[in-house]
From Swiss-Prot:
HAMAP family: PPV_E2. GO terms for cellular component: host cell nucleus. Residues 1-202 are annotated as: Transactivation domain. Keywords: Activator, DNA replication, DNA-binding, Early protein, Host nucleus, Phosphoprotein, Repressor, Transcription, Transcription regulation. GO terms for biological process: DNA replication; DNA-templated transcription; regulation of DNA replication; viral DNA genome replication. Residues 197-237, 260-314 are annotated as: Disordered. It comes from Bos taurus papillomavirus 2 (Bovine papillomavirus 2). Phosphorylated. Residues 326-411 are annotated as: DNA-binding domain. The gene is E2. InterPro entries: E2/EBNA1_C_sf, Nucleotide-bd_a/b_plait_sf, Papillomavirus_E2_C, PPV_E2_N, Reg_prot_E2, Regulatory_protein_E2_N, Regulatory_protein_E2_N_1, Regulatory_protein_E2_N_2. This is Regulatory protein E2.
Length: 411
């Protein structure tokens, strides 16, 4: 057992040294995966013999050890094969030889040159997905390891092999639009290039092989040629699915980015919306018509037309945080995890000592939705006596703050 502990310690120490070394040589990464293989082989053998602790290391389940050992064996053998080719002399970082990158699409090949491609659906900036594309793919074939060039266009993510078979798509944005889009329109932004106004449901786009755009030839772009925009820049402003356009190396948007939420007029008259008014359907995001109406109004127009906020007094209408008369509150703040755990304990052990408790909330910045300050919850009480009983019997963990106040409804 002592020998197994020593071998396990050496394997783990080797991994730490190679990680800290940050080498760009493929031979060092082969040594790393050899150490991972040794570690999990020892843990698997120990678990099979009923050992749960080996040295200072807990032994995982045998299935976990077996799977990790298989991964290490595959990575070790693949890197050894790659090191015997002309690609073995290239610089390789440890991330380039990680299992997660090796198994990302397209699977079981080594990848370099990662960049992010942004796909915006329905012209809605809040409905955006990001995809990772690699410029170089090292793929194992029957003739050995070969280098393939990869990229993105209006159809999806692709790679081109040296055999000249054209673009091979391993991810298509049209299929993603079927999941995330309601109109079928999407635009693709890849560094300083944009493919705008693409529709996954239009007949001309669907009938062409591999989604070739109208600006391309009948055979599509030649293999290895840099992709061109699917539409001229001058026509982008009329496209419903195109918000960003290309302008040199920067990006210019056609108007301000819309806020993802749209509130009807008069909704700002009350801080608390009655829960008896359900929200039906998706929240609209097009704010352009409303912005034009607000610009045409005079500054005093809101004062001339007072907003009437309906007030529900019947308990049958639904839940009300504030009740008639004065209500007692306790505002509790702390870190997000502290507040969440505190609310859980209070609801479980002291539910009879208060009326209601809100979910965790944050104060947001003036611009955007960036959180400021600490997390907060608001607890309501039926009377000052109930609040005193709560403060007496419910301890407040260190690092959290509590403030008490009394409020009443104005309308």
């Amino acid at each position: 057992m002592e020998t197994a502990c020593e071998r396990l310690h050496v394997a783990q120490e080797t991994q730490m040294q190679l990680i800290e070394k940050a080498s760009d040589k493929l031979q060092d990464h082969i040594l790393y995966w050899t150490a991972v293989r040794t570690e999990n082989t020892l843990l698997y053998a120990a678990r099979k013999k009923g050992v749960t602790v080996l040295g200072h290391c807990r032994v995982p389940h045998s299935v976990v050890c077996q799977e990790r050992a298989k991964q290490a064996i595959e990575m070790q053998l693949s890197l050894q094969e790659l090191s015997k080719t002309e690609f073995g002399n290239e610089p390789w970082c440890l991330l380039d030889t990680s299992w997660d990158r090796y198994m990302s699409e397209p699977k079981r090949c080594f990848k370099k040159g990662a960049r992010v491609v942004e796909v915006e659906f329905d012209g809605n900036a809040s409905n955006t997905n990001w995809y990772t594309v690699y410029s170089k793919l090292y793929m194992r074939t029957e003739d050995g390891w070969q280098l393939a060039k990869a990229g993105a266009d209006g159809t999806g993510l692709y790679y081109c092999t040296m055999a000249g078979a054209g673009r091979i798509y391993y991810s298509r944005f049209g299929e993603e639009a079927a999941r995330f889009s309601t109109t079928g329109h999407y635009s693709v932004r890849d560094q300083d290039r944009v493919y705008a106004g693409v529709s996954s449901t239009s007949s001309d786009f669907r009938d062409r092989p591999d989604g070739v755009s109208a600006s391309e030839g009948p055979e599509g772009d030649p293999a290895g040629k840099e992709a061109e925009p699917a539409q001229p820049v001058s026509s982008l402003l009329g496209s419903p699915a195109c918000v960003p356009i290309r302008a040199g190396l920067g990006w210019v948007r056609d108007g301000p980015r819309p806020h993802p939420y749209h509130f009807p007029a008069g909704s700002g008259g009350s801080l608390l919306r009655s829960a008896s008014t359900p929200v039906q359907g998706p929240v609209p995001v097009d704010l352009a018509p409303r912005q034009e109406e607000e610009e045409n109004q005079s500054p005093d127009s809101t004062e001339e037309e007072p907003v009437t906020v309906p007030r529900h007094t019947s308990d049958a209408d639904g839940f009300h945080l504030l009740k008639a008369g004065q209500s007692c509150f306790a505002l509790i703040s702390g870190s997000a995890n502290q507040v969440k755990c505190y609310r859980f304990r209070v609801k479980k052990n002291h539910r009879h000592r208060y009326e209601n408790c809100t979910t965790t909330s944050f104060t947001v910045a003036d611009n955007g939705a960036e959180r400021q300050g600490q997390a907060q919850i608001l607890i309501t009480f039926g009377s000052p006596g109930q609040r005193q009983d709560f403060l007496k019997h419910v301890p407040l963990p260190p690092g959290m703050n509590i403030s008490g106040f009394t409020a009443s409804l104005d309308f």
